[in-house]
Amino acid sequence: MCRDCGCSLGPAAQRAPFAAAPSVPGKTATIEVITAILGENDRVAAHNREHFDQHGVLALNLMSSPGAGKTSLLEATIRALDGRLKVAVIEGDLATENDADRIRACGVPAVQITTGNACHLDAQMVHDAVHDLPLAGLDVLFIENVGNLVCPASFDLGQHRNVTLLSVPEGDDKPAKYPAMFRAAD
């Protein structure tokens, strides 16, 4: 479902035939145009946002490169909040529950989304995970996206704000190399 990497351009992608104007009289060409790739994602994202709003939950999408420190930042934030706000976390990773286990060890509910080969979370994944969390009484839901500086920027998950984390060892040129990600940050 990516505009950036094309990871969903398989048989499920919606395509519409488009007849191009012939460049040579009497010859025609057919070009496939991909339509509304993110339309269903955006619909589910709007539903997620309504759900968060109805429960008074602020949803934050945390994005960065793999290993930049998203989970460490969440652990430090949870400790700093010291119970003043009720929080929960949705963790996105290609494999393992390692990060979700770290968050649970902080005493916070966490749901793991294991994406397999998908390089980002989408709204339906978040929707499904939300049903495993106690939204009633929550103040903040952190969504830790899959570590990737390309694809996550294109997907509305229903979050209220996007946070992009940049680690010093990555180099200071990441915003120039991955402008969509840093423009998506609030």
Where are these regions (language model features)?
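Hydrophobic anchor at the beta1->P-loop junction of P-loop NTPases
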Residues: 60-62
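Nucleotide-state-sensitive switch-loop elements of NTP-binding domains
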Residues: 16, 20-50, 54-57, 68, ...
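Long, basic/Gly/Ser/Thr-rich N-terminal segments
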Residues: 1-23
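Hydrophobic positions on the alpha1 helix immediately C-terminal to the Walker A/P-loop
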Residues: 73
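Hydrophobic residues at beta-strand termini and immediately following loops
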Residues: 5, 113, 165
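Short glycine-rich anion-binding loops that position phosphate/pyrophosphate groups of nucleotides
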Residues: 10, 64-65, 146-148, 168-171
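Inter-motif core of Ras-like GTPase G domains
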Residues: 137, 145, 152-170, 176-186
